[in-house]
């Protein structure tokens, strides 16, 4: 136990030193250099920072897996495939050659297929096949892209002639891996995987691979037509995934659609030409989304696998520390002020609305950001503000309370620390003038919410029919209980009426009541 604590402390100490040295650290290593076969890795600021976050999330997920999959027979198989999955993401992050990038990209898709297929039921089989086929389509685009690049390098083809087509292939490759519109269908279906896998996939591995690829080819993508195309695709992904998360009942799919919305947000940032700010938002999202998935997975696991949000209630029995962690991660997801989500989101919103885009796109972007609060509150309401019943058993252990404490601390403070030491991103937080428009913005949102509530009261019909009727049927289905309840009401009601009647008769016969009647009669006669 002491050795493990020492190793964990040593790893975090070395990670802190690496973060401290990151701004001035540049290193390139090649193990083999022979024509096409090149094993070359670059260690730059972005790659080291992302690998540090990936290591932190992976460590928390591996520890959480020992709790979540404790009784699984294929646990060793799961660990083996998961380590291949994480290793391929590390390799893709550091790779600087065609061979290593193709190898890492292919391993990432194959290992994700086996992880989604872990439970081996109908949902996992269909989800794994959908994931594999969509990623295979992206692999095809990537092979064609690198093939054209190799021929252009050997001067068989003109690079200027094929650069636009190659850039389009690169964009399609990133869109399939990051589940952008119209390749978004595989991401909710991949929720049939175990929750620790979902926590890793949706935070810092599979869905971020496409964005990492575009950032590596930043000079090729940053053309006027292509960044406008990236911006529009990111807007559509963000808008439709936010709308879908408001009507989805599966809680894991709600969190998955929120991930899709944030990936669209990062793609919009990349379309603005802010590749580094998009990377910073990816880092922030990886921290709090992995923690949110762990909290949701813990609640689902303690509720015996119940994922329907309509059947949850009375989760106040959860450990208070777990509730606090979930609330903090939802605050970071919304981008509330003084959270890590606000650091990147504020700067992105400022730069988006400072540009003169079409009114339609600006309105779509504003509605999509506003819907983030909608599905975050819906997720909180499903767990803690509902009135339906589901069987649950919560184990309030110290291990589960402090499992994702490191992720929560980093979600709150890491980007703020980077802001004051490395980045200098949101200088608006230093000025009082920023808070004036913020107050008016909150007032507009509040008034819009009240108007929508008054205009769309007919939407309550679904709630009254589906939720209240179901709850009433659940309470009235035990007829023996109803008989005893009515019998108890009859006996106690008869006793109550009998005692009150005897009291009235006694009071009416008394002298005091007669005196009061005489005084009232005299008063009316005088008036």
UniProtKB/Swiss-Prot annotation:
What top-level branch of life does the organism fall under? Eukaryota
Bilayer-crossing residues are 3-23, 43-63, 75-95, 98-118, 141-161, 168-188, 197-217, 226-246, 263-283, 318-338, 357-377, 398-418, 432-452, 507-527
Function comment: Core subunit of the mitochondrial membrane respiratory chain NADH dehydrogenase (Complex I) that is believed to belong to the minimal assembly required for catalysis. Complex I functions in the transfer of electrons from NADH to the respiratory chain. The immediate electron acceptor for the enzyme is believed to be ubiquinone.
Q: Name one GO biological process term.
A: mitochondrial electron transport, NADH to ubiquinone
Enumerate the UniProt keywords alphabetically: Electron transport, Membrane, Mitochondrion, Mitochondrion inner membrane, NAD, Respiratory chain, Translocase, Transmembrane, Transmembrane helix, Transport, Ubiquinone
What is any one of the record's Gene Ontology cellular component terms? mitochondrial inner membrane
Query: Which lineage do the record's taxonomy fields give for this organism?
Result: Eukaryota, Metazoa, Ecdysozoa, Nematoda, Chromadorea
Q: What is the catalytic activity of this protein?
A: a ubiquinone + NADH + 5 H(+)(in) = a ubiquinol + NAD(+) + 4 H(+)(out)
One Pfam assignment? Proton_antipo_M
Entry keyword Transmembrane helix: yes
What Enzyme Commission number(s) apply to this enzyme? 7.1.1.2
Query: What molecular functions are annotated in GO for this chain?
Result: NADH dehydrogenase (ubiquinone) activity
Q: Where in the cell is it found?
A: Mitochondrion inner membrane
Name the record gives this protein: NADH-ubiquinone oxidoreductase chain 5
Family classification = Belongs to the complex I subunit 5 family.
Provenance organism: Caenorhabditis elegans
Membrane topology according to the record: Multi-pass membrane protein
What result is annotated for mutating residue 94 to L?
In strain: CB4854
Q: Which InterPro entries match?
A: ND/Mrp_TM, NU5C-like
């Amino acid at each position: 136990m002491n050795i493990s604590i020492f190793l964990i402390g040593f790893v975090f100490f070395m990670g802190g030193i690496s973060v401290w040295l990151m701004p001035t650290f540049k290193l390139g290593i090649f193990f083999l250099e022979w024509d096409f076969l090149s094993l070359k890795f670059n260690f730059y600021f972005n790659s080291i920072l992302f690998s540090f976050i990936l290591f932190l999330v992976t460590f928390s997920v591996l520890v959480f897996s020992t709790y979540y999959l404790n009784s699984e027979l294929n646990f060793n198989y799961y660990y083996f495939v998961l380590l291949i999955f994480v290793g391929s993401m590390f390799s893709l992050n550091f790779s600087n050659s065609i061979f290593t990038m193709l190898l890492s990209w292919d391993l990432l898709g194959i290992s994700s297929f086996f992880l989604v297929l872990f439970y081996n039921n109908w949902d996992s089989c269909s989800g794994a096949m959908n994931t594999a086929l969509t990623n295979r389509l992206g692999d095809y685009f990537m092979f064609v892209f690198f093939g054209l690049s190799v021929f252009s390098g050997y001067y068989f083809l003109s690079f200027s002639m094929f650069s636009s087509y190659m850039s389009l292939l690169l964009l399609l490759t990133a869109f399939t891996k990051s589940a952008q519109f119209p390749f978004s269908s595989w991401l909710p279906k991949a929720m049939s995987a175990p929750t620790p896998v979902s926590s890793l996939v949706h935070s810092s591995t599979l869905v971020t691979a496409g964005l990492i690829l575009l950032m590596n080819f930043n000079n090729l993508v940053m053309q006027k037509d292509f960044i406008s195309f990236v911006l529009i695709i990111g807007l559509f992904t963000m808008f439709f995934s936010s709308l879908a998360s408001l009507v989805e009942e599966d809680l894991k799919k709600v969190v998955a659609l929120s991930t899709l919305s944030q990936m669209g947000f990062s793609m919009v940032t990349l379309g603005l030409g802010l590749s580094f700010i998009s990377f910073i938002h990816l880092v922030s999202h990886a921290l709090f989304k992995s923690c949110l998935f762990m909290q949701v997975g813990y609640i689902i696991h303690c509720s015996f696998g119940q994922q329907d949000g309509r059947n949850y209630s009375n989760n106040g029995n959860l450990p208070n520390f777990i509730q606090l962690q979930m609330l903090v991660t939802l605050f970071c997801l919304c981008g509330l002020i003084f959270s890590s989500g606000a650091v990147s989101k504020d700067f992105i919103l400022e730069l988006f609305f400072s540009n003169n885009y079409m009114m339609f796109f600006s309105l779509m972007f504003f509605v999509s950001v506003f819907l983030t609060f909608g599905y975050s509150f819906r997720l909180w309401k499903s767990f803690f503000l509902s009135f339906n019943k589901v069987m649950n058993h919560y184990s309030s252990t110290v291990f589960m309370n402090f499992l994702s404490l490191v992720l929560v601390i980093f979600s709150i403070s890491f980007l703020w620390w980077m802001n004051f030491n490395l980045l200098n991103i949101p200088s608006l937080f230093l000025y009082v003038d920023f808070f004036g428009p913020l107050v008016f913005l909150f007032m507009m949102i509040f008034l819009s919410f009240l108007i929508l509530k008054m205009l769309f009261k007919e939407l309550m019909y679904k709630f009254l029919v589906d939720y209240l009727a179901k709850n009433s049927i659940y309470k009235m289905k035990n007829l023996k209980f109803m008989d005893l309840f009515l019998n108890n009401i009859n006996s106690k009601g008869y006793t109550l009426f009998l005692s009150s009647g005897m009291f009235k008769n006694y009071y009416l016969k008394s002298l005091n009541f007669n005196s009061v009647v005489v005084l009232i009669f005299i008063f009316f006669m005088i008036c």
